[in-house]
Amino acid sequence: MSQIIRHLSGMIPYMVLIMPIHIIVRLILVKLRHLKWNWYHEIGLFLFVAFIAGLASQTVIPPLAMGADGVKVVWGGHQRTALIPFRFICYTLRDLVVYHSAKSLLIDFLGNIVMFMPFGFFVPLLWRTSDKTATAAGFCVSLFIEISQMFLPRWTDIDDLILNTAGTVLGLMLYKKLRSRFCGLMDRFQIGAPPSRKFPS
């Protein structure tokens, strides 16, 4: 549990930092491109961008540390590259069944799945995309992260790619389930939906 809290607390500063930047950039783009202002879409996009910033802080942004000379990038650390599919997944299930340890299951196994559910949920929510496009978005982002981690003090594991993609699919299933019940509300978040309010000139 402490490791989960540490990851979440590490995400928050980056999510807070990106918020004003996103708002400023978005306002400029809306003005320059004369876009219709849709509060539903903008709020959804705001949350999605904040999530991406938090995800990046735990995956591709090098760890930072405060020292006497200020903030420094921590380049030292553990590196691991695992390219055998399902190896980590099998180890996780072994730990659960044989050793009755759920640590890897909760933090790494389920964490990798839950962490990518927003891709499967927000991509079709905010843009008119097919199921394949939404799934491919999560897969490509995960692939980019795993390749990037080869050059960072982080771990690269092909099972992460598998679990991340599974999480994207689950997020997509959640979106489709909610849309089947709240179609009118969910469609308001997409580009091209009637503007909820005219953007002030």
Task: Give residue spans per PLM region.
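Bulky hydrophobic segments
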Residues: 1-155, 173-201
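Loop-to-transmembrane alpha-helix initiation sites
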Residues: 156-157, 161-162
